Amino acid sequence: MAGNSIGQLFRVTTCGESHGVGLMAIVDGVPPGLALTEEDLQKDLDRRKPGTSKFATQRKEPDQVEIISGVFEGKTTGTPIGLLIRNTDQKSKDYGNIAQTFRPGHADYTYTQKYGFRDYRGGGRSSARETAMRVAAGAIAKKYLAEKFGVVIRGHVTQIGNEVAEKLDWNEVPNNPFFCGDVDAVPRFEALVTSLREQGTSCGAKLEILAEKVPVGWGEPVFDRLDADIAHAMMSINAVKGVEIGDGFAVAGQFGHETRDELTSHGFLANHAGGILGGISSGQTIRVAIALKPTASITTPGKTINLNREDTDVLTKGRHDPCVGVRATPIAEAMLAIVLMDHFLRHRAQNADVVPPFAPIEP
C-alpha cells in the first residue's frame, strides 16, 4: 500500500490498524535541539482520544504515546522520531457480521476491490483511529512553529448537523466536548447528538482552523502551493468531503472590488484570501474550513451486498461517533501544522539568504 506518508522535508509516515497491536509513526526532518517530551504530544492526543464524553465513541483508549527514537536527554537529535501508541480496547467480535458483507458508505468495498482482501475489524487501516498518529506528529510541528515563530494553530467547530454556532470565544472552546466557541450553541449541539444516537443515525459537521503569525513567504508554486498542500492534507482526513481556504465557496458570489485584499504601507485591509496569495503565505492569518460527512456506521439497517455479490442487509455494530466532527478539531490542527512545518523547511532550504526589498507589512 502506497500513500502512507506526507511531506517532503518534514515527512510523516504512519502505520497500524484499528484493531491491530498499535499505531506507529516515523517523523523525519525535525530539527535538532527541540526540547521534546511525551507530555508535549499527549496534550493534543488527550483532546482527540475516544471515550472522553457521551457524544463520541465509547471505545476507551488511553492513547498513551511512546517516543522510541530521535530524542536524547529531552531534546531532538535530528534523526527520525519513532512514535508508538498501543491499542488496548479492541472488540473485534463486534465486526464479525461484516466479514462477509460491505458496510455502505465505508471503504470496505473499495479496499476489497483494490487489494483483494481487507481487515474488517473496525475498518482496519481505513479507520479514523489512524489519525491518532497524525495528532502526535502534528504536536511536534506545532511546538516547533510556536517556539520558533510564535505561530498559533487552533480550531473550533462551527456547525453540527443543522445547528450553527454564531459566535466565537476561544476561551469557551476547551470547555465543552464539541470544541465550540459559542456557549449558546453547545446545548443545541448536545440535544442534537443525543437525539441522533437514540435514532440510530448520525450527522455531519463543519470546522474552522486558523494559523496565526505564519511568516510571509512559505509555499512552493506552482504545483506545491501552500493552499494546495493544505487542501491535500485536509482531504486526507477520514470523512472530509470539502475544504475551503479563506472565503472559500462564497467567492462565487463576490465581486473583485470587494474582495481583493487591498494593502497599504500600514498593512492589509482585508483577508478574504485566507492568508495565502499565489500559493505563498502573506503573513496574514491562514483560514481553513472543512466539512465532514455523517459517519455511515449507524445502527439503522442498510442495503448492501456480500462477498458472493448477493443483495443483503447490514446492521453496523461496534462503538462509533454519532458525529465524527466532534473529535476532528485536533486532527485538522495537526494536519495544518504538518504542512506548515514542511513548507518552513523547504523555504529555509532555498530562500534562507533572500533579502526582500522592504520589511513585511502588518497582517
Swiss-Prot record:
GO cellular component: cytosol
Lyase listed as a keyword: yes
Pfam families linked to this entry: Chorismate_synt
Pathways per UniProt: Metabolic intermediate biosynthesis; chorismate biosynthesis; chorismate from D-erythrose 4-phosphate and phosphoenolpyruvate: step 7/7
Keywords recorded for this protein, A-Z: Amino-acid biosynthesis, Aromatic amino acid biosynthesis, FAD, Flavoprotein, FMN, Lyase, NADP
CDD domains: Chorismate_synthase
SUPFAM superfamilies: Chorismate synthase, AroC
Cofactor(s) this protein requires: FMNH2
Positions contributing to NADP(+) binding: R48
GO molecular function, one term: chorismate synthase activity
EC id: 4.2.3.5
Enzyme class: lyase
Catalytic activity: 5-O-(1-carboxyvinyl)-3-phosphoshikimate = chorismate + phosphate
Record-level GO BP terms: amino acid biosynthetic process; aromatic amino acid family biosynthetic process; chorismate biosynthetic process
Disulphide bonds in the chain: none
Cofactor descriptive note: Reduced FMN (FMNH(2)).
Binding sites annotated in the UniProt record for FMN: R125, S126, S127, N238, A239, G278, K293, P294, T295, A296, S297, R319
Protein role: This reaction introduces a second double bond into the aromatic ring system.
Subunit structure: Homotetramer.
Family to which this protein belongs: Belongs to the chorismate synthase family.
Protein name (record): Chorismate synthase
Organism from which the protein derives: Acinetobacter baumannii (strain ACICU)
